[in-house]
């Protein structure tokens, strides 16, 4: 009996590509304040694995959860949604 496991995916913007085979992705989410009801934007920076160093700053990517690859890295970049515009 094999079970299918749902893989968590998030979408975010690459804010750093200075590390080898790793990018930092800023993931924003909107939550409602429990007391006042105002919609607040919260952000989280996640390190994700980029095997070929192909993603750059400003790219919008989809990351998916995987096994731990290092102390701080347990996500892998799965697809490119939008390439950053070059100036």
From Swiss-Prot:
Transmembrane segments: none annotated. One of its GO terms (molecular function) is rRNA binding. The keyword Lyase does not apply. GO terms for cellular component: cytosolic small ribosomal subunit. The keyword RNA-binding applies. InterPro entries: NA-bd_OB-fold, Ribosomal_uS17, Ribosomal_uS17_bact/chlr, Ribosomal_uS17_CS. CDD domains: Ribosomal_uS17 (cd00364). Keywords: Ribonucleoprotein, Ribosomal protein, RNA-binding, rRNA-binding. GO terms for biological process: translation. Belongs to the universal ribosomal protein uS17 family. Part of the 30S ribosomal subunit. One of the primary rRNA binding proteins, it binds specifically to the 5'-end of 16S ribosomal RNA. PANTHER family: 40S RIBOSOMAL PROTEIN S11 FAMILY MEMBER, SMALL RIBOSOMAL SUBUNIT PROTEIN US17M. This is Small ribosomal subunit protein uS17.
């Amino acid at each position: 009996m094999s079970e299918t496991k749902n893989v968590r995916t998030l979408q975010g913007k690459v804010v750093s590509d200075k590390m080898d085979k790793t990018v930092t992705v800023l993931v924003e989410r909107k939550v409602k304040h429990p007391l006042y009801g105002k919609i607040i934007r919260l952000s989280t920076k996640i390190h994700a694995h980029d095997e070929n160093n192909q993603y750059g700053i400003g790219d919008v990517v989809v990351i998916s959860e995987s096994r731990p690859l290092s102390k701080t890295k347990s996500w892998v970049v799965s697809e490119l949604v939008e390439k950053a515009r070059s100036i």
